[in-house]
Amino acid sequence: ELTESSEELYYPILDRIHESLHEKYIEGLYKKKIEQFDAKDDNLTLVQQYIYLTKWVSKDLDDEALNNIRKVFELMKAQGYKAILRFAYNHAGLNTSGGESKQWILRHIEQLTPLLNEYIGQIATVQVGFIGAWGEWHTSPLANDQDAKNAIVSALLRALPVPYCVEMRYPSHKKALTLEQEEYRGRIGYANDYFTAGEHSHAPGNDFVPNTDDYKQITGEVKANNFYMSGEIPYNEDTEWGLAALITPMKSLRILREHRYSAFDITQNFDLNIMSWKQVKVYPSLLNDNNILFDESYFKDAEGNEVVRSFYEFVRDHLGYRLNLQSESTVEAKNGNLEYNLTITNTGFATVINPKEVYLVLVSGDGQVAKEIKLDVDPKTWIPSTNEEPNQVAKYVIKGSAAAGLSGTYKVGIWMPEKVADLKYNPAYAIKF
């Protein structure tokens, strides 16, 4: 029989965790944030991890630095998290200088490369930080050094294995780059650190405002390359740059879909916009009217009864990918072979960005996996809809036959583990349907 999990995959950003490498790490590093932002039932799987190299700004990363970074990854692994990483030197903020230089940033990327590759299965993306206050590319001796920026982005792209992505802040930053390997440009996504749905007075030039050249550029790029996109709302502050007003939920939803967001911060503006999203209800008719894709099963419980969803829940559950095994899928045993004809849809905002393998597995009555059958498919191609039919959910058919090599009665399932060997059999890092 063909079985499918009812679990859901959630990919919001858990929190901005700012840590200097000389600080002590504790086992409850992320648990406290889960409790602080009322997310115990959200099954969050992603954290934005800042790592400050302040102490080493003009010298080699020593064993202390590298071992502490390793501790961060091991803590994340123990709790089943992946990370959006950002390295920086200046955590003091504006009107200060971290003293960073092209020479030492390139040296540090060189030193970090083996470690990044060792833990690549726990990395969602790496933001191109290093320069400026909080790694935001301002308030820096390198602010106007384009040669340094070219070299740093090129080095970081080389450090990560293809097809893993990096993120930059603005399309203008990306346009200005001269890369050492131009073919890597499609691996540069964006981190929208000022998501306001274009509704703040400072949105132009800071947010990606609908109908602007920047917005159109990102829309075209993400369709062509399916790179990583993430965002965060400004803090709820009655200041020039704060956001002390509610932004329009459906407009936000359309942006998340059009720019194929994979992650979103739930901590900034938590007490205003995020809490409001938890109260606003979303209905199938409203989504249909706005051409937002979804699977009908999302609005039903296990018994088939209709359920009401909040805007927060819908965003939480559709960031990145949301894979659905369709009811017409079949798996049959014939003459010692397993014949499969599977139909999968993806109603998430984006797709499976980083490498995953796809298997059929035969599961015995006692719950043990008796056989793994690897399928020759690339889930990154499972985009939610095609350019030809942008408002229709695309269907992906996986059809074939494989020698079962077993006799008896088994359940059949789809297994999509992390490709990296040390995480392959860690269920926390497998895709859930």
Where are these regions (language model features)?
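Catalytic-core regions of glycoside hydrolase
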Residues: T125-G132, E136, S140-K281
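Extracellular/luminal regions of secreted and cell-surface proteins that mediate adhesion/ECM remodeling
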Residues: E313-F433
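Aromatic-lined substrate-binding rim segments of carbohydrate-active enzymes
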Residues: Y30-N90, Q103, L160
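Boundary/entry segment of secreted carbohydrate-active catalytic domains
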Residues: E1-T45, Y50
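An active-site-proximal structural segment forming one wall of the substrate-binding cleft
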Residues: E64-K82, G98-Q127, D147-A159
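Structural preference for beta-strand elements that scaffold enzyme active sites
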Residues: E8, L44-Q48, G80-I84, I123-Q127, ...
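Catalytic cores of secreted or luminal carbohydrate-active enzymes
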Residues: L253-E328
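Extracytoplasmic/secreted cell-surface and envelope-processing proteins
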Residues: W56-K59, A92-S97, W134-H138, K175-T178
